[in-house]
Amino acid sequence: YPHNSDWDYIAKLMNDPTWHSKNMHKYFKRLERCEYIPKWKFWSRLWSRHGFDGWLPTSIGDSTMLRQDKVLKKLIGAAFKESISESWHTTPNPIKRIFRIILKLRSRLDPNHWRLIRRNLEGLSSIPVTIHQGRRAGTREYLQRVRKEFPDNLVIKANTLVQRVLLDEHNKAYGVEYSIGPHQYRADPKHRKADTFKAEKAFVEREVIISAGAFNTPQLLMLSGIGPRDELEEHHIETKVNLPGVGKNLQDRYEVGIVSKLKENIPLIKGMKLRPPEAGEEAD
């Protein structure tokens, strides 16, 4: 779950209190089905502010597996010791030091625990995953389940690329123009310039929701005439709405991978193939 400061910054920037972190956290609770805090732990459920009735199952790895692997147990122990040491030296107040350590332990190193989110505590934590009974359970699986239950209400088209959003004279979206065929996107290594695809249109009675990712969402808006006028005119696109911010200020958090060579092998993952099993083959 993001830092509260991320949501609060957007709320301030847009002058829209609905983006405030306390309000946005309600949506997280609506979609989450936390499976690693049992029902009988009433106070843990209450203080963590997780969601327990949503469609997205969340779980954490079984810590008892550490008992099977002394090397992995040693690594986790060293990481925890370093995390505690860092927190101890960066927090001047000794009472706050102890409080932070206790808070980490009481929250089971859960990065989605509300108290940790609110204080933005750094250091060692568990990694929540969207897995249910050993199988991946994300947006894809949810959509497939809904399509199976309500085939008349949800249609999913594969190999389909939206070209632009259709806007009326009042710049209200009333549909999309799209084409069907594989490898249409030019960034696809299998894309061929010679291929042609028939354009089709789909119309809506309510609204068009654009959810195409950090890069394709602004691209689709600009192809539809929504974006900085100078750039749209450069590509001979009629400007419907002049919004200079579209396609700008794309940011992400830094991720730095660290590769280390261990003196000892990790027994727990010995023999793992790290790939889907073949037909008749047992999974890792």
PLM features: residue spans?
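Structural core of flavin- and non-heme-iron oxidoreductases
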Residues: 1-284
